[in-house]
Amino acid sequence: MRLQPSLLLLALLLLKVTTIQATLGNNSWEEQTWPEGLKNFPFPCRPEEIPFSPPSESVHSLRISDIRVVGAIGNLETTPDAKMVLKRQKWIERNQMQTCMQVMTVLSDFIKKFSPSVLPLLCPSREKVLPRMRNEDLGPQARELVQHMKKNQKLNFRNDWKLINVFFNAQSQCHPCSSSQKEGNMTSSMQELIRLLDYLQKEVPKAFVNLVDISELGNSIQSNNQENGPRDINEVCECPQEPSRLTTAVQRWYYQNSWEKLLTSGRYDTKDTFTVIYQSFLHEMEPSVFPIKQTSGSSLKKLSTALAVSLWNGMIDPTGKKEEFFTTGQRIPVKCPTQKHPYLFTYRNNNKLSSTPEIKRISETREGTEIRCPDMDPSNAVPTSVHHLRPADIKVIGALGDSLTAGNGAGSTPGNILDVLTQYRGLSWSIGGNENISTVTTLANILREFNPSLIGFSTGTGNQNSAAAFLNQAVAGATSETLPSQARRLVDLMKENKRINFQDDWKIVTLFIGGNDLCDSCSDPPRYSSQNFTAHIGKALDILHAEVPRVFVNLVTVLSIVSLRELYQEESINCPRVILRSLCPCVLKFKDNSTELTTLIELNKQYQEETHRLVDSGRYDTRDDFTVVLQPFLEQVPMPKTPEGLPDSSFFAPDCFHFHSKAHARVARSLWNNMLEPVGEKKKEENLENIVDLICPSESQPYLRTYKNSNYTYPTATPTSSPKPDYGSQLWCEDRAPSASFPTSVHALKPADIQVVAAVGDSLTAGNGIGSKPDDLPDVITQYRGLSYSAGGDASLESVTTLPNILREFNMNLTGFAVGVGSADDANAFLNQAVPGAKAEGLKKQVQTLVQKMKSDPRINFQRDWKVITLLIGTTDLCDYCTDSNLYSATNFSAYLRDALDFLHREVPRALVNLVDFMNPIIFRQVFLGNQDKCPMTQACSLCNCLLTVREDSPELARMKEVVKVYQTKIRELVESGRYDTREDFTIVLQPFLEEVKLAFQDGIPDVSFFAPDCIHPNQKFHSQLSRALWNNMLQPLGKKMDFLDLTADTTLSCPSLEEPFLRTYRNSNYTYPANPAIENWGSDFLCPEQGSSNSAPSSVHQLRPADIKVVAALGDSLTTAVGAGAKNNSNWSTAWRGLSWSIGGDGTLETHTTLPNILKKFNPHLHGFSTGTQEEAAGLNVAVEGAIAQDMPSQARILVDRMKNSSEINLDQDWKLITIFVGSNDLCQYCENPEAHSVKNYVQSLQQALDIFYKELPRAFINVVEIMELVGLRQIQGEKCAVTTQSICPCFGRSLDNSPELQEMKNINRHFQSGSSLITYHHQYMEREDFAVVVQPFFQSTVVPLDDKGKPDLSFFSVDCFHFSERGHAEMAIALWNNMLEPVGQKQTYNNFTHSRTKVKCPTSENPYFFTMRNSGLLRKEASHKTPSVPFWAVLVAAAASFIVGVVLVMLWRTKKCSRREERPISLVATVF
């Protein structure tokens, strides 16, 4: 027997705990012997080198050898973190006690080297450790520890030296939540600790107390389990301000600094026999730094050892000079006492405590300036080109970025570290507007000298949401990932502000980001790659470029951040290094000249180079009123120095990280000067030590410099490069005004009334490959959402033709469109929620997400705004149709589409939905196969297997063409049903322009210039035509809409007419939906590929294909004899129309009559046994009898066996037989009149007896047992035309009152009948033979009465007696039974779906060509046959129930495993069609 690893680990853990645990005294405290794994710890100290001396009388000359006992108070819990792996968090909580023991064991073992007689360590017992221990909980532990030491006979309490460690977690304490708190303030939690220390000082003589802050222990444990570092203190303490790394670092520093100040004050040094030392766990640590041989030991043990080593070193090192930081890969050295310093360091005996006097900070007076230029006037006329923009033309200023733009600490007084949390936005270099230029130098104040009416600048203090921040939307602690959302908010603020003329005012926006990305880059290199960095910037710029007219964007490149190390490493400067390390670990934690530092420096350069490349691409110079100019003055900025050559901290806030107002002023000067320097000649190195003069625009060049007015050519451009194609359009409409009064009807909706645009669908709508270069196949995965025909909003209509850009010509305040590139989750995707590779099945999720976004977005008035939503789906379903014709059937496609549209209809007010007919995949088959030298032929299978890999003129291709037509028909039927025209403010309009696509040809070959490199996705050239066709379709009346798209046509954009100014709907088109065509018959279309029988007749029922069935038969009552199935009036309603019977009828063909035999005849035309007509002589093997009950089943079974044996057409031994049993309705209907005769027990026993006969007499048999339906629904069926009433034909259900106990009892009995028939099929006896199977088919388990359009029972499914089924009902039962047979046991549909469709018949698949049984469904293992004695029926039920439960569990496991396999598959959008 093999022991599972998890069980082995548990066993060893229990063994270890049992072995090491012992007790002292009253079991309140626990000791631990030395763990085996730590005995080989490389301890370097040599006690014999320290001269012997008698025990010390003073704690300030205490040696290690003097310590007699080691104890601990508190626990080593970690602060829970929402992102921490839950299992690991729980494991840590369970092992807090063990951690304390391990830490104290290591420490005790160190001490034993010097003091062999030291007593066993003391830790609180498990019972005393609370799961969330706070400082106030430590008091009882302290008192118990003192009592234990007093009672311990091995310890001289008055004279022996004691080492007591008080563990607490500063991170779990509530620090001040605002910078208004003074540093000296103590929280109540700190006061609790002080009371504890006061108690120890009073009660415990001769004690050295370590106050151990283990905050970073939790962070070290969590560092391997989360991305964003330690849990923020604001979250723990519920502080109102937003959590940030800066807040966490500053507040933790505040707490630790407060303790240091208190302890160095001498409060606990009033006696020579007692002292308290503050010890902080090492800031960052990995297992690799532990001086332990790397074995399979737990990381928790390693962390415990690290904490012990940290404590040891803290006692040996001079206080205030402790080693605070170890880098990745650096091992922690174990410090040793020396002859010169053999004692434990205290605050009193530390002659190094008084640090080197701080270098005096240079004056921090704010720097004003002045600017006197000869020409400070605006242009004579408001310029239309950004390349002719004077400073005085700027009317609006904005900024994006991080805390350097937010102004954190810019106005803080020296030493006030808490105040660094304050965001002095009014002093910010790029947008601050405090006072004026004479006292505060900022870009905004400089521009105000040219235009005093400038708006947008920030003043005072506050975060980005404060009113004073205005258009300074920088977020403290931000990385480049947040830029798109910042840009989005900035645009919205500019649009909403009434003081800003959004269309006409010239705006300047400064963007500066990257420091925090670099500071975190080593923790997640892929996340902070240069590619991602510039991609995030690109997305933000895309938003500005797409939406904001008249903008000059300053893109300031990231500074060279490595110079920060100079400030950190200079010991003479009093910087809070704990804060610096927390804020920027990747810059500070590595050694000089290390590989890691070199990597950081290289990444810094890549950030700068990639930013240059982004701007040099010219992608933001496609309009005359927009440009992005790179301002590189910070790229090589050196650390400013004092006259003594030391880093000048006066340029920095008290945290030595953020800029002080002095630096802000110098940087503002440099930015201004950079803006007036020609592109290509801008300064990249600015020495902040020097106060530079502000330059003026020259007479010859009075403009802010751009690439064009600098006569600059981007390096990436080549003289021979062809000009970028123009895909814009002209709109010549005169009337672009909205309705005179806000419309309330969707049928009176003008284009200018549309305020919101949205889209859902697949990769065509997501924009895959639209902007890809012809030879760049991998780029097809890029989602160019801003160029998408129905939802893109890049640039304007002049250069990019999309539906939103057309609508923006009518309403410039349109919202919802996407810009740039990215996934549906990106902010710039907005309401383009299309997902690449999406199928109809996932459409409802898309519309749910869309609606949620519309409801929650402040830019959208969900109830009032008019919306246009465009939906296109279906191509991907068709491309996968041949892989599973059941899953991708037209019926399922229609159902999924209906669910999504129903949701929109139900949830969204004021909406016009464009339902665009999908693009026929036959089109790109032509393109793909016609350009085999240009298209990726090797990817044909993954791109669209069902169409690209089949032969021309093959049956498979013909079948696919038919399926395409059925899909299109389903879409049209759905819209024309009128179900979405029940409200005045909602409609769905079918836009059919893609029904037929005329390709462009070159030399007789389809022109690939309209397609992306995969020859599948349309490129921008194609999308432009799609946009024009969609728009024109929207203006064409129903019944006259263009149903084709000519890619070669020079399509112009239509305009609403004066007579018809509205977007066209069925009503304003005076259109009447065509009446549904009369249904000629209830037949079905057979769309399954040709599938023959097995190569040889199978010997196993678990490998039985439909074509293997030679004989069909049935048992049952009047529902199987088909009483009334073909009746047209009361005169013949009692006739048995056996030829139409769902399970055994064989009249006509499948195309005219849907029955199980007619389906089977498509696989085997030589099928025997089915019944025809109405005469009993033609009943075949239909032995059902009208009025039969379960007790009749054994006799029917006997009759059937005899008929088979006597038939000359049947080879009893060799022919495979399919028998369907359906009985029980009469038993239920008569149950209340004779419960004993019609009991569940009798019902099940009768079924078992019939099955036993078949099992004994019939070889090669597959038995369908159909669960009885829920008869309570029959009560709904009533009408004047009904020949009989439910009361008379089924009294037990018809006579009971609604909600009566009698009716409820009958419902229960009904369920028991279902359960009984289901469980009996699990009898082990029926699983013993390889050629016999009984399978329950549960499609009636939850019976749904079909309803008509008015919500009443649809009597077309019932015969004239309103009880038996009509031919339509029999057809639906046949389809449900057949489909059940092709569904795995445990996954069968358990309800009837009686909706008409000729394509609902499922097909066997190549993966699953057999009828499903228990075994081939994966629920049973193949076992050797063996005989078992007969058992009582109720024992069978118990066994069957157990088997059923096991089966359900197995199914769940199988499905989970299957789903997990699906999830593990890599996603390749290149290999995903639409």
UniProtKB/Swiss-Prot annotation:
Membrane recorded as keyword: yes
Pfam families cross-referenced by the UniProt entry: Lipase_GDSL
GO MF annotation list: lysophospholipase activity; phospholipase A2 activity; retinyl-palmitate esterase activity; triacylglycerol lipase activity
EC number, as in UniProt: 3.1.1.5, 3.1.1.4, 3.1.1.3
Cytoplasmic side stretches: 1454-1474
Top-level taxon of the source organism: Eukaryota
Membrane topology: Single-pass type I membrane protein
Leader peptide range in chain numbering: 1-22
Keywords attached to this entry: Cell membrane, Glycoprotein, Hydrolase, Lipid metabolism, Membrane, Phospholipid metabolism, Repeat, Signal, Transmembrane, Transmembrane helix
Location of the region described as 4 X 308-326 AA approximate repeats in the Swiss-Prot/TrEMBL record: 36-1417
SUPFAM superfamilies: SGNH hydrolase (SSF52266)
Homology family: Belongs to the 'GDSL' lipolytic enzyme family. Phospholipase B1 subfamily.
Protein name: Phospholipase B1, membrane-associated
Gene: PLB1
